[in-house]
UniProtKB/Swiss-Prot annotation:
Belongs to the SNF2/RAD54 helicase family. RapA subfamily. Residues 473-627 form the Helicase C-terminal domain. This is RNA polymerase-associated protein RapA. Pfam families: Helicase_C, RapA_C, SNF2-rel_dom, Tudor_1_RapA, Tudor_RapA. GO terms for biological process: regulation of DNA-templated transcription.
Length: 948
C-alpha cells in the first residue's frame, strides 16, 4: 500500500541520515517535497519509492523539543495524520509535544534507535561492521603496527631500530648508520609508528635545502605521510596567523630558517612533539663557539620532547663533533667534552675485549681482567661461566656490557661490515677520444668535466651540430644499450639539460625506448617515467636521470648503471651508485664509466678509482679526503704534469688507507650488536613477510569497495584499477584521486611500480575506509531470514554486538590493551546465549535478506518483545566486558612494570636513561589504569533473525 504523506509529518532519509529530521512540505502529483531544517536542504522524491522512513517514537523514548528541552514519551496520539506526544519533562511536569516541534537535529545513530525507526541496513553492511571491528582490534595489538605497511623491503636492522626508538616516550637518539644502510627509512619508520600509536602528533623535519625534495618523495611514496614543504614563498603567502599550525608534518630547509627570524618565531610558537634533523654532522660546534645552525637546533631540542638526529658515523665525525651531536640530545649527561673523551678512552679496552669474545668465543686473561674491572664483583660468576664455555653466559655477558655502554641507548650505528646483503660491484671503464669540438672550448668552472653543457650554451649552435651528434660517449651508449638488449639500464648525468638531450639523441639516432627523469618534472611526471622504466613488457630499456632528479628513488630492479659523467664530490658519486647498490639487490652492480681521454674527466676517474677506491667500495673517508685534498685537486684536473698528478694520487691513497685502518680499529662491535638487534629484527622481517602472504586484506577490501560503490577491475598481474562508480555511497571515501587509482597488495610490485598505491592495513585508504564504517551508523542494524531445520519457523533470534569502549588520549595506546573487538551475544527466545556454540561465520552462511519494507513491518510488530530482550543482552555481556577490562588492566600494568624495572636497573649503570623517561612511564601507567576503570559497554549493532 502506498504511504500516506501529510504536510508537517517528520520523516528521515534512508540514504542521507546526516540531514536530520525532514518535514513534509507538499505532495504534488507524483512528487514529494521534504525540507531538512537542520541543514537547510530540500529534496524532491518520486512518490512511489521515496527512500524515507516515518519517524514514530514510542512510550519510554526520550525526545527533544526544537528549543532544547526533553520529554519522556508516555502516550502518542494520531491527529489527522500528525503525531502528538504526551509525557513528562525534566521537572516531571506533564507536557505535550507535536511532531512538528521536534528537534531538527535528531539523528538515529544508536543501533536500537535506528532499528525501531525503521532504518534497517543490508546484511553485507552488518558483516562489514563486524569484520572491521575484528581487523581493527587485530592491528592495534600487532607488534608490526607502523612497521609493516611501508613501501620498502623489510630489513632487520632498520626494523629493530625503528621499534626500539619509536616505542619510547619522546625518544632522543642519534641515527648514524654508514651510507647506504637506510637512515632516512629508519627515521620514516620511527615517525610513522609514533604517529600511528599517538605518541607523536606533530613532527618537524629540518633538512638541507638540497635534500628537501628527496625527503618529500620518501615520506609520501614510502610512508603515505602528507608532509608540507615550507619555504619563504609559502610562509609569506599563507593567510594563517601561524602557517606552521596548519600542518601536522612540516618539512623545512635549515638554510632558510636560520636567515628568517619571523619564521623561527612562528616555528617555536607552533609546538612540536618530534624534531628530525638530517645531515646533523654539518651543524658546526666548538667548545668556545657554535654556528647559527647548531644554536637554532639546540634551542629547538630544548623545547621539543623527541629528537632524531641523522648523521655520519662517529668515526667519520671525530670525537669532538660526535660529542656535539650527543649534547643536543642530553645536555645534562653530555656537558663536558674532556670528561666524554676520558670516558670513551676508558671504554675502548672493554669494546676490544668484547671483540675478542665474539671472534674467538673465549676471553684471554687480559680481556677477563678488563671486563672484571668494568663490571665489578657482580660480574665474577658470569665471567667464570664464560670461561667454562657457557654460550648462554657469553650472550648474557654481552647484554650486561651493552646496558652499561656509555651511548648505547642514544646512538644507533650499523656498518656494512656488520650488515650482510650488499651486492658486489664491477667496474667497466671506457676511455674514448676527446673530439676537437670540445678541445677548442674556452676553459671555465668544470667546463671540461661537462663539456656538452659548455658547448651547447654557445650562441647559434645549429640543430645538425648539437653536441650529441659528435660526442663519442653517445655512440658508445647506443652500442652498449644494443648489447644489453632487454636489460634495464640506469643512466645518470650531472645536469637536466644533458639528460633531456640524451633522450633526444636516443630517439633520433637509435629508436631505443628511453625515458627521462630530472628536477624540472613534477612528482606525477616522475612517477610516470619511473613506471614506464619499471614495466618489463612494454617499458623503456633505459632511464636517464639528472643528479638531483633521481634523489629518493629506488631502481634496484636494475643492476646496470652508466655514469655518463662524474660528479665533483665523492658523496654524490656514492649517492649515484646507491640508487642500485642497496640491501636486497640480487645482482652484481655493473658500473659503466665512459670518459674522454686526455681530459679532466680522465683525471677525475683516476682520482675516484685509484686514490679513493670509490667505484668498487663505499668510501666512508671520501668527505674527509675531499676536504683535505680538494684545493689541490681541482687545479690539477686541468693543468698538471704526470709526475705531479701521480704524486697526488699516491699521497691521497696512503691517507685513505690510514683513515680506513683508523675506522676499522675504532669500530665498536658492542655498539654494532646493539644497533643490529641481535636477531630481534630478523623475527620482525619474518612476521612482516608472513603478513604479506595472507589474503585477509584483499578479501576485506573487496567487501569495503562493494559497500561504498567503488568499482575495481584488473589492471595487470597483482594490480587493480579503482574508480568511483555512479552509485558511490560516500564522496569522502579516501580513494586518493576522483579519476581513479591503481593499487597493488604485492610488496615487490609496489617497489618497482611507484605509480601504484601499495595497499596495506596501514594505508590511508584502508584506515580511512575503516573509520568511515565505524564512525557512521550504516551496518548497525539488520534483519535476516535464517534457514535452519533445527529452528521452528517464526522463531526469533537476536544477535547483539557490543564494544568495550574507553575514551582516552591516543598517546596512552589503550587500544593495544582494550581494542574494539566485538563482544557478541546470540540470544534465543528463552534468553540463552548461543554465541559460544554458533560462530559469526557459521551463522552468516545460513542467512537470507529480507525486503526492507517487510523487515520494518516485522520490527514494529515485535517492538514490545524485542526491547526487553535487547536490555537482557547487556546483562548477559556485562561479565565478559568486566573480564576484558580486568585483563587489559593486568596487561597494561605488567608491561609498564616490566619496562619500569628494566629502565630503573639500567639507570643504575647507564646515565643516558633520563629521569623524565621514568616519570613519563609512571604517569602513563597511572593514567591508563584510571581510564580503563571508566571503560563502558556500548551496543554497536543489532541483527534480528527470523526462522523461515
Amino acid at each position: 500500500m502506498a504511504q500516506q504523506y501529510q504536510p508537517g509529518q517528520r520523516w528521515i532519509s534512508d540514504s542521507e541520515a546526516e540531514l536530520g529530521l525532514g518535514t513534509v512540505l507538499a505532495q504534488d502529483g507524483r512528487l514529494l517535497t521534504v525540507l531538512y531544517p537542520a541543514t537547510g536542504d530540500t529534496r524532491q522524491y518520486a512518490l512511489r519509492n521515496a527512500p524515507l522512513t516515518r519517524v514514530r517514537f514510542s512510550p519510554g523514548d526520550s525526545i527533544t523539543h526544537f528549543e532544547g528541552w526533553k520529554m519522556t514519551v508516555q502516550e502518542v496520539d494520531d491527529v489527522d495524520g500528525l503525531l502528538v506526544y504526551h509525557g513528562l519533562n525534566g521537572q516531571h511536569e506533564q507536557v505535550t509535544l507535536p511532531e512538528t516541534q521536534l528537534s531538527n537535529f535528531i539523528q538515529f545513530r544508536l543501533a536500537s534507535d535506528r532499528l525501531f525507526a525503521g532504518q534497517i541496513d543490508p546484511l553485507a553492511w552488518f558483516s562489514l561492521r563486524y569484520h572491521t571491528l575484528e581487523h581493527t582490534s587485530r592491528q592495534l595489538q600487532s607488534s608490526l603496527w607502523g612497521l609493516g605497511g611501508v613501501r620498502a623491503q623489510p630489513i632487520a636492522h632498520q626494523l629493530h631500530i625503528a621499534r626500539e626508538v619509536a616505542d619510547r616516550i619522546a625518544p632522543r637518539v642519534l641515527l648514524a648508520d654508514e651510507v647506504g644502510l637506510g637512515k632516512t627509512i629508519e627515521a620514516g619508520l620511527v615517525i610513522h609508528r609514533q604517529l600511528l600509536s599517538g605518541r607523536a602528533s606533530r613532527v618537524l623535519i629540518l633538512v638541507p635545502e638540497n635534500l628537501q625534495h628527496q625527503w618529500l618523495v620518501e615520506m609520501r611514496r614510502r610512508f603515505n605521510l602528507q608532509v608540507a614543504l615550507f619555504d619563504e614563498e609559502r610562509f609569506i603567502e599563507s593567510d594563517a596567523t601561524n602557517p606552521f599550525e596548519d600542518t601536522q608534518l612540516a618539512l623545512v630547509a635549515l638554510e632558510w630558517l636560520v636567515d628568517d627570524e619571523k619564521a623561527q618565531d612562528a616555528l617555536f610558537a607552533a609546538g612540536w612533539d618530534l624534531l628530525v634533523v638530517d645531515e646533523a654532522h654539518h651543524l658546526v660546534w666548538h667548545e668556545d663557539k657554535a654556528s647559527a645552525e647548531y644554536s637554532l637546533v639546540e634551542q629547538l631540542a630544548e623545547v621539543i620532547p623527541g629528537v632524531l638526529l641523522l648523521t655520519a658515523t662517529p668515526e667519520q665525525l671525530g670525537q669532538d663533533s660526535h660529542f656535539a651531536r650527543l649534547r643536543l640530545l642530553d645536555p645534562n649527561r653530555f656537558h663536558d667534552l674532556h670528561a666524554f673523551r676520558a670516558e670513551s678512552e676508558n671504554y675502548r679496552p672493554v669494546a676490544e675485549a668484547v671483540q675478542e669474545l665474539l671472534d674467538k668465543g673465549r676471553l684471554s686473561p687480559k680481556a677477563h681482567e678488563t671486563i672484571q674491572g668494568f663490571l665489578g664483583n657482580e660480574g665474577e660468576a658470569l665471567l667464570t661461566a664464560v670461561n667454562d664455555g657457557d654460550t648462554e653466559a657469553s650472550a648474557r655477558l654481552v647484554r650486561e656490557l651493552l646496558d652499561r655502554h656509555g651511548t648505547g641507548r642514544v646512538l644507533f650505528r650499523n656498518t656494512r661490515a656488520a650488515v650482510q646483503g650488499f651486492p658486489e660491484r664491477k667496474l667497466h671503464a671506457y676511455p674514448l677520444p676527446n673530439p676537437d669540438e670540445y678541445m677548442e672550448l674556452p676553459l671555465g668552472e668544470h667546463a671540461e668535466l661537462y663539456p656538452e653543457v659548455s658547448f651547447q650554451s654557445q650562441p647559434d649552435v645549429e640543430e645538425e651540430h648539437r653536441w650529441w651528434r659528435f660526442d663519442p660517449r653517445v655512440e658508445w651508449l647506443i652500442d652498449q644499450l644494443k648489447m644489453l638488449k632487454r636489460t634495464k639500464v640506469l643512466v645518470i648525468c650531472a645536469h637536466a639539460e644533458t639528460a633531456m638531450d640524451l633522450e633526444d639523441a636516443l630517439r633520433v639516432r637509435s629508436g631505443i625506448p628511453a625515458t627521462v627523469f630530472h628536477e624540472g618534472m613534477n612528482i606525477l611526471e616522475r612517477d610516470r617515467a619511473a613506471a614506464y622504466f619499471a614495466d618489463e613488457e612494454f617499458g623503456a630499456q633505459v632511464l636517464i636521470c639528472s643528479e638531483i632528479g633521481s634523489e629518493g628513488r629506488n631502481f634496484q630492479f636494475s643492476h646496470h648503471l652508466v655514469l655518463f659523467d662524474l660528479p665533483s664530490h665523492p658523496d654524490l658519486l656514492e649517492q649515484r651508485i646507491g640508487r642500485l647498490d642497496r640491501i636486497g639487490q640480487k645482482h652484481v652492480i655493473e658500473l659503466h664509466v665512459p670518459y674522454l681521454e686526455t681530459s679532466p674527466q680522465e683525471r677525475l676517474f683516476q682520482w675516484y678509482h685509484e686514490a679513493l677506491n670509490a667505484f668498487l667500495n663505499t668510501c666512508p673517508t671520501g668527505n674527509a679526503l675531499q676536504h683535505q685534498f680538494g684545493p689541490r685537486l681541482l687545479p690539477l684536473l686541468e693543468n698538471a704534469d704526470d709526475g705531479e698528478w701521480q704524486a697526488l694520487i699516491d699521497e691521497a691513497r696512503a691517507e685513505r688507507e690510514r683513515l680506513e685502518q683508523e675506522l676499522h680499529t675504532g669500530r665498536d662491535r658492542l655498539l654494532e650488536l646493539n644497533s643490529g638487534g641481535a636477531g630481534e629484527g630478523d623475527a620482525l622481517v619474518e612476521d612482516i613477510l608472513e603478513q604479506d602472504d595472507q589474503f585477509a586484506l584483499p578479501i576485506y577490501m573487496e567487501t569495503l569497495f562493494d559497500a561504498f560503490g567503488i568499482d575495481s577491475e584488473d589492471h595487470s598481474e597483482n594490480a587493480l584499477i579503482l574508480k568511483p562508480s555512479e552509485k558511490m555511497l560516500d564522496a569522502s571515501f579516501p580513494l586518493g584521486d576522483d579519476e581513479g587509482v591503481t593499487i597493488t597488495y604485492d610488496r615487490n610490485q609496489a617497489l618497482s611500480r611507484e605509480d601504484m598505491q601499495f595497499i596495506t592495513w596501514e594505508h590511508p585508504m584502508v584506515q580511512g575506509g575503516m573509520d568511515l564504517v565505524l564512525s557512521g551508523s550504516m551496518g548497525n542494524t539488520a534483519v535476516a531470514l535464517i534457514k535452519n531445520k533445527a529452528l521452528k519457523p517464526g522463531t526469533v533470534l537476536l544477535e547483539l554486538l557490543y564494544v568495550s569502549e574507553v575514551v582516552a588520549p591516543r598517546s596512552l595506546q589503550l587500544g593495544r590493551y582494550l581494542p574494539p573487538a566485538a563482544l557478541r551475544c546470540l540470544l534465543d527466545a528463552n534468553g540463552n546465549d548461543l554465541s559460544g556454540r554458533v560462530t559469526f561465520e557459521t551463522l552468516n552462511d545460513q542467512l537470507e535478506s529480507v525486503p526492507r519494507a517487510s523487515a520494518n513491518k516485522f520490527i514494529q510488530a515485535q517492538r514490545d518483545q524485542l526491547t526487553p530482550r535487547i536490555n537482557a543482552g547487556e546483562e548477559k555481556i556485562t561479565p565478559r566486558h568486566a573480564e576484558r577490562v580486568a585483563e587489559a588492566k593486568r596487561r597494561l600494568a605488567a608491561d609498564t612494570d616490566e619496562e619500569l624495572a628494566r629502565l630503573t636497573a639500567l639507570q643504575a649503570v647507564n646515565p643516558t636513561v633520563r629521569d623524565s623517561e621514568l616519570v613519563a612511564l609512571r604517569t602513563q601507567r597511572e593514567q591508563g589504569l584510571a581510564m580503563l576503570d571508566k571503560a563502558a559497554l556500548r551496543l554497536e549493532a543489532i541483527r534480528v533473525l527470523v526462522a523461515g
